[in-house]
Amino acid sequence: MIATGDKVRHPKMPDWGIGKVLEVTSDGKARIFFIHAGEKTILLSHVDFEKIEGEEAAHPILDNPSFFERATVKGHRSLPDARLDFLKLFPDGFEDAGYLNEERNYKVAARELLLELLSEQAFRELLGSGNFDEIVRRALQVANKTNLIFPNEKMGLKDGLKTPEHIQLFAERLFDLLYGNGEFRKRFETFAECLEEIEAAKWTTMTYFTFLAFPEKHMFLKPEVTKHAAALTKAELNYKSDLNWVTYSCLLDFARYLKDELVAMEMNPRDMIDVQSFMWCITPGKYD
């Protein structure tokens, strides 16, 4: 017998993935949310569910304390559905020539530019000589290499870097964010404070440079695109427009989960550039 909160698997529907029991009703039915199929109401006398326990039952989405609240939102488009939509656009997935030309190559080019202009050694030498203006010039050049940061937000960053004090603050905080030795959370928060000080505190600006410098572990946050992808998987993003560590930490957890799921579906993303591009491509209206 299964109960509310149990993790189960449908013996005849393995593609539905792991499910969590939302409710067992008095008339012998169970409402179950399956991670790849959404909510199903099933007569228990017709199915002998496999109960999942122990380490196998651990799941970053289903185990989140706010899962039940998110699971009750009506309508469900599954990750496998989104995968099919992506493959309609790019039949060869992340190796598709169209995908590489339209979505990946220009981001890789921006990463290469950042590593050329603001490598740790080059950045350190510029800081050591007090050449803060050149650091800002290079950072803005990297920002302008892609369309990831909205034009008005690029302008806001540029406008915030007019005084010597703001230019030096930004240069020092950006170096610490990318190459500092302290705990990353603290480096993140001090860079966020810098962006607030110069009135350029936007999530795109906040996450752009680490995303390009370290795409194996850091993610870019474009709010509406990311919120759509998180809602699709019922992930908890804890999104707030103000820059904060909780939202970014949830973003990293979600990005790792999504990457793992794409690997399990044989999509094999190389890094978070592919994962972010996938999120963009499956957002309604982006390729309609």
Language-model regions, residue ranges each:
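An N-terminal alpha-helical hairpin/helix-loop-helix interaction module that forms a charged
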Residues: 29, 56-198, 216-288
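Helix-hairpin-helix
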Residues: 193-210
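Basic/aromatic-rich interaction segments and small domains that mediate binding to polyanionic partners
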Residues: 1-53
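Short, flexible loop/turn elements at secondary-structure junctions
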Residues: 12, 211-214, 279
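N-terminal, helix-rich and Lys/Arg-enriched segments in bacterial and organellar proteins
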Residues: 9-11, 19-20, 209, 225-226, ...
